[in-house]
Amino acid sequence: VGDQKAKEPEYTAVSGTETSVEPTGVISVKRESDNIMMVNYLDLKTSKSDKKDVYFMNALIGLFNENGVAMGNPWQHKIQYKKTYLELDAQFKAESAFEASYHFNINPNLNAEVLKSIRAVVERPELWTVSINGNEVSKTEGRYWIDKSFPEFAVGQFLKPGKNTLTLKAPRMHVLAEVMPVYFIGDFLVKPAKQGFEITDGNISTLGSWREAGLPFYSQKVAYSQTYKVTKADGTAFKVKLSKWNGSVAEVLVNG
């Protein structure tokens, strides 16, 4: 005999017996994690070329091509046999050094304290030095986004309203040097700019599209709270209907 509890029967509505309950007060909308902005275009400078505003994947493939790897990024093609790909690293010389610069904009309306609290996320920091507006920064020990391969960098003190630049400098090409997007995390909104997106002040406050509200790259939770006054009688059941809702999972909590 197991200790599994018997499932309660599913509620089946009887036509004509449902009554809509109107909310009281204004709905509360709150983002439960820091927002994020991705920057996936960059300038790439090597001893052989100087490319501007390149999509990261094109920059990555071109970087391998320039250094004698005709297939481009080997890790995108097939599973490595023995150490075939790792052994490619021996062919990269000192003159294969490169510099990748990511430009992004911060709206002057951003609160100064929020600006200082912004962090950057850069993959594989052991392969290059990271600098923000010319100031070299190191990863914050024990702080990472998603997993430990995405360490955080405290860059807020070096940021400024307007154009900013995060730069990666590699002393030489490396077989693991996949030039990927960089990310910025903080309590801000992300809005379309003349080119790409920019970090702006504000908080999500209404129902509707996250993308249009300033969360185009956000993938965590948003809490929506609404008050209802109801009278519970014997035999009464309550149903929550999410109209025009697009999402992965919705969790409903009653009184916390």
PLM feature segments, named:
Residues 84-96, 100-109:
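Regulatory/sensor and coupling segments of signal-transduction and defense proteins
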Residues 1-5, 248:
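Carbohydrate-binding surface patches
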